[in-house]
UniProtKB/Swiss-Prot annotation:
It comes from Nitrosococcus oceani (strain ATCC 19707 / BCRC 17464 / JCM 30415 / NCIMB 11848 / C-107). GO terms for molecular function: aminomethyltransferase activity; transaminase activity. The gene is gcvT. The glycine cleavage system catalyzes the degradation of glycine. InterPro entries: GCS_T, GCS_T_bac, GCST_C, GCV_T_N, GcvT/YgfZ/DmdA, GcvT/YgfZ_C, TrmE/GcvT_dom1. One of its GO terms (cellular component) is cytosol. This is Aminomethyltransferase. Its EC number is 2.1.2.10. Belongs to the GcvT family. Gene3D superfamilies: Aminomethyltransferase beta-barrel domains, Aminomethyltransferase fragment, Probable tRNA modification gtpase trme, domain 1. It catalyses: N(6)-[(R)-S(8)-aminomethyldihydrolipoyl]-L-lysyl-[protein] + (6S)-5,6,7,8-tetrahydrofolate = N(6)-[(R)-dihydrolipoyl]-L-lysyl-[protein] + (6R)-5,10-methylene-5,6,7,8-tetrahydrofolate + NH4(+). The glycine cleavage system is composed of four proteins: P, T, L and H. Keywords: Aminotransferase, Transferase. GO terms for biological process: glycine decarboxylation via glycine cleavage system.
Amino acid sequence: MGKHTAIFDLHRSAGARLVDFAGWDMPLHYGSQVAEHQAVRQGVGIFDVSHMTVIELKGEKVRPFLHQLLANNVDRLTVPGTALYSCMLNTEGGVIDDLIVYLMAEQEFRVVSNAGTRDKVLAWIESHAAPFKVQVEERPELAMIAVQGPEARAQVHGQLPESLKEKVVNLKRFQATWEEGLFVARTGYTGEDGYELLLSGSQAQDWWRRLQAGGAKPCGLGARDTLRLEAGMCLYGADMDETTTPLESGLGWTVAWKPPERDFIGRAVLEAQQAAGCPHQQVGLLLQGKGLMRNGQTITTNLGEGVVTSGGFSPSLERSIALARVPVGADGPCEVQIRGRAVPAAMVKPPFVRNGRACVPAELMEPIEVS
């Protein structure tokens, strides 16, 4: 039996199909993954993401510590409640994890990272924190609920205490606000607007019930994956890992090169890769024939072979889509090897869908039958 979140009993009583995810028993879906996906694109869905790792970093030298630890620059965060997305790299420039870091106070930051990387992330942070005398504290007692979709903000606003409502309503993307017992961030992993709520485990079931009573549809990991894939968002362990750099994984935008004297871990390798010319790039793939793209499938492009890093069926576009790593400069039509067949596909720039709207060229959307 795996670990259980504070909301687990509600998942089980709702008849969720439970699966193991990084040692946690988590809902894959509650009956229809496609219906859950569409609820987020068209209305509002809720996700239990309490398996995510939450870490508090405190100390006089916490900012210099994060200058070294992260590829992005926390000096962009000057006001408490602001946040940024970053990769944390090893000495070879590989991605240990991708994460969100929030400025909580002048000498305090909060990091939210992936569940599957918990042990190595904590070990890496702790091994580098000592010289800076930074206090590292995990917060496993906190639960986390993602409320996503075009109706998500209104749904949350209706449940907030008056003391917090105006602050939350005025949040911009990648901003957060909080009071005792409730942290609200305007972030997400679906390509839709919404919030992620951090709260004590004792409050989690009450919030879940109230959000559901207000019309939010419970959603599982299956819909979470198809939503993030449509949004062109990377999945750790598939689209990037410790053997790939941000530059070849579509994450070059998360690397802060300035100031040049900020010597973050992995910087020298990234600079050398950039100077030599990064050999790979990330692209989106839109299948033009029957089949389903999956991780590991070979792609034949105009400049050589590539590989699908994550793929699946897009409920919004009604065809298979994927993220892929291909030779730099490759473009145009390509072929994907699916069960021994070469199936035509088109290379496109992600995202595929954002805010409920298709982002791919209309001429590539001729109806096809997907098996």
